[in-house]
Amino acid sequence: MNEQALAQRTNRREMLKLSGMGMLAGVAANALTPAKAHAAAEAVDVVYASWIHGNSMEIEYPDRIASQRHIGYYFEIEGKPGLTNWFHFAIPTPVLVNDARLRIKKVMLRFTTASVDAFVRDVHVYDGEKRIAVFDEVYLSGDNWFAEFVLPDRPEVRWGLGISLGVGFGVEMMDHHMHFISAGCDFTLQEPEPVEV
């Protein structure tokens, strides 16, 4: 019986030694981790992300479109030359998470255009009927696999998020097709950074 108790104490003693070494190893590894990695870990403040497929997009002026086609992987639009239009995405929006009101960190778009003569000119963000962010004259064309628009004020969400795209189609003899894949938003609980005066 005494030998068994001695063996148990030894095992406990050995475990305590090893756990102490493990703690020291963890402290050493933490100290050797680059500061950039620590900053990146602290910067993760997205508590909810929501995306909607491009096939859900609405066209404000359908008569200004030469053709449109819903395909499994995107919504294909061909604009009439020399005209502008507005396309709208309604993002599924949680306004509260664990009794805390969410804030908008950034909105994102995924789309392509077939030429520089078909472009996204403006990006407007709405919470219900209130316009909360304006990114005018961005003129995006070509491959935009992940275009981000950060809202530095991080406004609270109350009524539902909408992203409206002002688009344009030039008059050049170029392809005026656009392919909208998806649109989304990152939500946070963090308030905006204080502005130094």
Predicted regions and their residues:
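N-terminal secretory signal peptides
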Residues: 1-14, 25-28, 35-37
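C-terminal segment of N-terminal export signals and the immediately downstream linker at the start
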Residues: 30-57
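Short beta-strands within extracellular/lumenal beta-sheet-rich domains
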Residues: 78-100
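A short beta-strand element within beta-rich, extracytoplasmic domains
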Residues: 100-114
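Short, surface-exposed beta-strand/strand-loop-strand elements in extracellular ectodomains
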Residues: 117-129
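Extracellular carbohydrate recognition and processing domains
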Residues: 132-154
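Noncatalytic modules at the cell exterior or secretory-pathway interfaces
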Residues: 153-174
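Exposed low-complexity, polar/acidic, P/S/T/G-rich flexible segments that act as propeptides
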Residues: 168-197
